[in-house]
């Protein structure tokens, strides 16, 4: 059975400290290369404290508020007979203190105890993108959530987990069974990652997009001093100069394109009047007039789109 560490609000100092030196469900998704939110390299820097933990977003806050509704829906439609949902806190594996789980609910067969769960429930809120999720009732939620509940099942020693998702397109439920082979590999990768943390060995970032590496460096250096640095690497200097040149050219091209676009729309507006489309003598469409609906449901002022 897993060992309870405590029950703290998500994002609280105690919650963050419990996760600092341990590997949780979202962490294992990053370590295994399945997370769309962060890489091994980013996770390493967060664990080492070289960048701050991610702040709570509006979407995360919304998920906190809708979680009880999704749990109630799951209880009404999918909770197995003879089981109950229990709120829970932060746990670790009984033999691996570094393996952490923070599930939304435990599924128990004793309404008065959470010590021996039979399953795990993870709740997600997403505003759109139904195509990223499988069909209701299948076993294929997005890979990073699949990895998360696999990790939780391993901590608690249970054989299945459900993922309940609430979105603008309704509710869906995914039933995931424990994958022992994948978990064996995941534990091995997690132990290697922890060793790299302890030894201060930074993961290879050669496959990281430059934009992501830049974002990390910005977070690592939040202050501005009067110091001046000299860059003496010729390749770096050439790349920086080329980037500055391309940036300036793009700005000039964008400004020129905007001038031409405005001039074209001025001409079109006079020709088109209230017409929907403008065409050339051979029938090629040049532009279309459209109108977006306002909050009152009425169409707004028409605008021209160039084809």
What residues fall within each predicted segment?
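Accessory terminal regions of nucleic-acid processing enzymes
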Residues: 1-307
């Amino acid at each position: 059975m897993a060992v309870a560490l405590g029950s703290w609000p998500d994002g609280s100092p105690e919650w963050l400290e419990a996760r600092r030196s341990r590997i949780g469900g979202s962490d294992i998704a990053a370590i295994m290369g399945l997370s769309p939110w962060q890489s091994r390299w980013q996770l390493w820097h967060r664990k080492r404290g070289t960048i701050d933990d991610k702040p709570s977003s509006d979407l995360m806050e919304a998920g906190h508020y809708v979680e009880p509704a999704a749990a109630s829906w799951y209880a009404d439609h999918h909770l197995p007979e003879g089981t109950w949902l229990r709120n829970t806190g932060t746990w670790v594996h009984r033999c691996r203190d570094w393996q952490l789980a923070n599930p939304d609910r435990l599924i128990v067969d004793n309404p008065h105890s959470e010590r021996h769960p039979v399953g795990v429930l993870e709740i997600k809120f997403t505003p759109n993108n139904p195509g990223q999720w499988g069909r209701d009732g299948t076993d294929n939620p997005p890979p990073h959530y699949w990895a998360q509940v696999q990790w939780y099942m391993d901590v608690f020693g249970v054989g299945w987990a459900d993922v309940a998702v609430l979105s603008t397109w309704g509710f869906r439920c995914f039933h995931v069974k424990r994958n022992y082979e994948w978990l064996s590999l995941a534990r091995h990768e997690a132990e290697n990652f922890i060793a790299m943390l302890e030894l201060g060995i930074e993961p290879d970032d050669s496959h990281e997009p430059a934009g992501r590496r830049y974002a990390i460096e910005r977070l690592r250096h939040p202050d501005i001093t009067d110091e001046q640095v000299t860059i003496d690497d010729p390749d770096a200097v050439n790349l920086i100069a080329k980037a500055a040149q391309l940036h300036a050219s793009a700005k000039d091209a964008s400004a020129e394109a905007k001038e031409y676009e405005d001039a074209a729309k001025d001409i079109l507006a006079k020709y088109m009047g209230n017409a929907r489309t403008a065409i050339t003598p051979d029938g090629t469409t040049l532009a279309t007039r459209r109108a977006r609906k306002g909050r009152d449901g009425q169409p707004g002022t028409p605008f021209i789109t160039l084809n």
